[in-house]
From Swiss-Prot:
Flavoprotein keyword on record: no
Compartments, as annotated in UniProt: Cytoplasm
SUPFAM superfamilies on file: Ribosomal protein S2
Domain of life: Eukaryota
Subunit and partners: Component of the small ribosomal subunit. Mature ribosomes consist of a small (40S) and a large (60S) subunit. The 40S subunit contains about 33 different proteins and 1 molecule of RNA (18S). The 60S subunit contains about 49 different proteins and 3 molecules of RNA (25S, 5.8S and 5S). Interacts with ribosomal protein S21.
GO CC term, one of those recorded: cytosolic small ribosomal subunit
Alphabetized UniProt keyword annotations: Acetylation, Cytoplasm, Ribonucleoprotein, Ribosomal protein
N-acetylalanine carried by residues: 2
This protein's name: Small ribosomal subunit protein uS2y
Family from the record: Belongs to the universal ribosomal protein uS2 family.
Coiled coil: none
Signal peptide residue numbers: none
A biological-process GO annotation: ribosomal small subunit assembly
Length: 280
């Protein structure tokens, strides 16, 4: 039993270290030049250029806490993940796709959580936001409706009405995508959808923001490939595409149909005699 416990602890440590290395490569640790007094506990140090460095060990712990809260809600449709920042819209849609929660990508419609006369009115049990500054409207409405809020908070983010603040860089496209990918994987592991020791087959690149020009360029390239391997049109078809060997063979004669029972063919089908009975 003790050996199994040590092995499990070693696996968890290695997984945490791998996640921290991924967050380092995605610049999750880079804060801003300003620091809110409520975010000082999550700051590791300050660089010479004035940028605050976030302690990624505490970021990973807060991701685990947020995943436990998400798993504790029975119906995933009672959770709304939202991002008004363009860099986080693709990430929230992918997070909603793999975890089953509802996503709102784009501008928040005022009154979504407070005005019952609206068609888009909703009463979620949990709210997940990308940035407390850009998503200030849903935070205020969630506070009026007593909705718990989870948010990715930078060093200068306001912490008012935020129940679980995950310290991280919430302004970079790679950082936001990496955070939502890690949170989605932790949620699926706690639900038992994927094994803890099993590597998730979904790439983190799918959660990254893509420029519209880049997506359009890839779409044009796919269209060109389909045009190259498409069928030849009627105006482009020529006999040169058929080899000479295909023309030299003899044409097979069609199989003649068997004569109908009771019908006598004399000289041809025109002169066939009409049967005496059986047509009725």
């Amino acid at each position: 039993m003790a050996a199994n416990g040590v092995a499990t602890a070693g696996r968890q440590v290695s997984e945490k270290e791998a996640d921290i290395q991924m967050m380092l490569s995605a610049d999750v640790h880079l804060g801003t030049k300003n620091c809110n007094y409520q975010m000082e506990r999550y700051v590791f140090k300050r660089r010479d250029d004035g940028i605050y460095i976030i302690n990624l060990g505490k970021t990973w712990d807060k991701l685990q806490m947020a995943a436990r809260v998400i798993v504790a809600i029975e119906n995933p449709k009672d959770i709304i993940v939202q991002s008004a920042r363009p860099y986080g819209q693709r990430a929230v849609l992918k997070f909603a796709q793999y975890t089953g929660v509802n996503a709102i990508a784009g501008r928040h419609t005022p009154g979504t959580f407070t005005n019952q006369m609206q068609t888009s009115f909703s009463e979620p049990r949990l709210l997940i936001l990308t940035d407390p500054r850009t998503d200030h409207q849903p935070i205020k409405e969630g506070a009026l409706g007593n909705i718990p809020t989870i948010a990715f908070c930078d060093t200068d983010s306001p912490m008012g009405f935020v129940d679980i603040g995950i310290p991280a860089n919430n302004k970079g496209k790679h950082s936001i995508g990496c955070l939502f990918w890690l949170l989605a994987r932790m949620v699926l592991q706690m639900r038992g959808t994927i094994l803890a020791a099993q590597k998730w087959d979904v790439m983190v690149d799918l959660f990254f923001y893509r420029e519209p020009e880049e997506a359009k360029q890839e779409g044009d390239e796919e269209a060109e490939v389909q045009a190259d391997y498409g069928m030849v049109g009627g105006d482009q078809w020529t006999t040169a595409q058929i080899s000479d060997a295909a023309w030299s063979g003899e044409v097979e004669q069609p199989i003649s149909a068997a004569p109908a029972v009771g019908v006598t063919v004399a000289a041809g089908w025109e002169a066939a005699s009409v049967p005496a009975a059986g047509w009725e």
